[in-house]
């Protein structure tokens, strides 16, 4: 059960969740509910004040973020983290310098990584500032996949996308899951979450208020009201 602070303010209160092998799980809540803080706590971008973060039965609570990436935790942030003045290819290279890929990560890169978003191959030489919002998200997810993760953390991957593009991204998440990679998605839109996840957690004011089958949450008026704000 994790407690996390941003400065003096406690953001997460006794948060506990689990993602199984090959499972897609969504963390749903309105803006400011604690979704991004949860993702950042798992990735090691924010220190956990108390509680534990475990990965494959290993306590990684005090392990730096880059070591978590090396261990197999992939991460695509909400803002995508794309360097605007660098090409897409150079953005990939920067990642490999910061977090050297595991020995087998580059083997079959085209088959495994670009099969999710083959569109990325078409703009590898384009600079980040010339990418659309959807293209930036594609690059962020592909970049995370290039490190051969066992689990992928996606922070608001569908935000700001047109409905047809959301469907494309949901198909991509399903393809990632079909590779045996676990996925944890922070998502504000409950309908999108229900389309892609096996299980769902709802968070509000830093506390988990629901967990279970995504279909069940639609029958819970209190949770629905809270999520919608």
What do the PLM-derived regions correspond to, one by one?
Residues 144-145:
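ABC ATPase C-loop
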Residues 51-59, 71, 105-110:
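Conserved ABC transporter NBD signature motif
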Residues 127-131:
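Conserved ABC ATPase signature
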Residues 152-156:
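Catalytic Walker B motif of ABC-type/P-loop ATPase nucleotide-binding domains
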Residues 43:
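Helix-to-loop junction immediately C-terminal to a conserved catalytic motif
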Residues 28-30:
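The feature captures the beta-strand-to-loop junction immediately N-terminal to the Walker
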């Amino acid at each position: 059960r994790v407690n996390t602070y941003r400065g003096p303010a406690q953001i997460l209160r006794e948060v506990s969740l689990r993602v199984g092998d090959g499972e897609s799980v969504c963390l749903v809540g309105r803006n400011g509910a604690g979704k991004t803080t949860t993702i950042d706590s798992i990735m090691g971008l924010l220190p956990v004040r108390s509680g534990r973060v475990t990965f494959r039965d290993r306590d990684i609570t005090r392990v730096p973020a880059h070591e978590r990436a090396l261990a197999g935790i992939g991460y695509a942030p909400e803002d995508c983290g794309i360097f605007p003045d660098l090409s897409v290819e150079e953005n990939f290279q920067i990642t490999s310098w910061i977090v050297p890929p595991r020995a087998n990560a580059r083997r079959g890169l085209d088959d495994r990584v670009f099969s999710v978003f083959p569109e990325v191959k078409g703009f590898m030489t384009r600079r980040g500032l010339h990418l659309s919002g959807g293209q930036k998200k594609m690059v962020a997810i592909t970049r995370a996949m290039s490190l051969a993760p066992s689990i992928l953390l996606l922070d608001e991957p569908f935000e700001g996308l047109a409905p047809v593009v959301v469907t494309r991204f949901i198909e991509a998440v399903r393809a990632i899951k079909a590779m045996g990679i676990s996925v944890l998605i922070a998502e504000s839109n409950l309908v999108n979450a229900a389309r892609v996840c096996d299980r769902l957690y709802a968070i509000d004011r830093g506390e988990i208020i629901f967990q279970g089958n995504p279909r069940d949450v639609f029958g819970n008026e209190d949770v629905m009201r809270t999520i919608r704000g």
